[in-house]
């Protein structure tokens, strides 16, 4: 089905290539899904690292509480996306048939715990005395318990209309950073060597959400007044998208292009849903049904 799009600016096209563009971005996949997923995982992880270090360093020094709180959602999405991509890159190293790949991805979808279980099965690996193997299983299990479908950090509530943070929660950015780095390093090492690393890491509980830490190295979420509001999520993705855009333009970080696009795409979806639920004349119950029906669609 074709659509007659009305662009904000004239002569715009998603497929337009301007040879005179000051900041050209070239995207070329290798054709090998394992290699391509590995590269995308690296890009998303790098973007997440850039954001968390900015928050923990420059933003913390400026006592910019708003950024520390709001940017959490986009940052954790970038980290989670990197884990899903590196996990699937490992699976695609073993499974090379297109049919089998589709079947496995359809089975595990976005569930990191199921993906890890499948990877262990495919590689004939078992839980051993290796602390990293067991820690990672517990960590990914905790993520799946909270965010099985990769939705809970994108929207103020899930398809069941339940909120993730039903009370004010002070999340440690340091613990989040350390745990995400450990998980990513373990999966990257498995991809590179075929074995689980014996490296020792900073010890934190294998949990996605760990409270505590220095006040200006925390993200505080779950404010009651914004419990079901789209604003914090919309602002998070839009502002982090702008931040990554500036890094691309000013520091030539072209590898952040795809993560930036995801930030903007999510912001557009959230902005549209915000209008439907919070600013339209549609009765709230009907508006929520529209959201459930549309899922991730922006059309």
Predicted regions, residues:
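Domain-scale activation on soluble regions of proteins
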Residues: 1-299
């Amino acid at each position: 089905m074709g659509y007659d799009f009305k662009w904000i600016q004239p002569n715009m096209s998603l497929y337009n290539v301007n040879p005179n563009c000051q900041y050209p971005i070239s995207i070329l996949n290798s054709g090998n899904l394992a290699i391509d997923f590995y590269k995308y995982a690296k890009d998303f992880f790098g973007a997440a690292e850039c954001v968390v270090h900015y928050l923990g360093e420059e933003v913390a020094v400026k006592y910019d509480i708003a950024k520390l709180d709001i940017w959490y959602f986009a940052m954790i999405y970038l980290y989670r996306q990197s884990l899903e991509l590196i996990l699937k890159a490992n699976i695609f190293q073993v499974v090379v048939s297109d049919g089998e790949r589709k079947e496995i991805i359809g089975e595990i979808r976005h569930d990191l715990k199921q993906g890890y279980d499948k990877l262990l099965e495919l590689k004939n690996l078992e839980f051993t005395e290796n602390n990293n193997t067991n820690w990672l299983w517990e960590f990914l299990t905790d993520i799946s318990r909270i965010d099985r479908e990769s939705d809970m950090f994108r929207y103020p509530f899930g398809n069941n209309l339940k909120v993730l943070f039903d009370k004010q929660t002070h999340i440690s950015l340091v613990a989040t950073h350390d745990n995400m780095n450990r998980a990513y390093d373990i999966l990257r090492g498995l991809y590179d060597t075929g074995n689980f690393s014996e490296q020792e890491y900073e010890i934190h509980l294998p949990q996605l959400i760990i409270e505590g830490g220095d006040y200006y190295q925390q993200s505080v979420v779950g404010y009651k007044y914004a419990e079901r509001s789209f604003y914090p999520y919309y602002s998070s993705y839009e502002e982090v998208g702008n931040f990554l855009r500036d890094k691309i333009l000013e520091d030539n970080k072209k590898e952040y292009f795809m993560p930036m696009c995801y930030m903007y795409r999510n912001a557009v979806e959230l902005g549209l849903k915000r209008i439907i639920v919070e600013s339209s004349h549609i009765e709230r119950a009907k508006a929520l049904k529209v959201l459930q029906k549309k899922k991730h669609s922006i059309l």
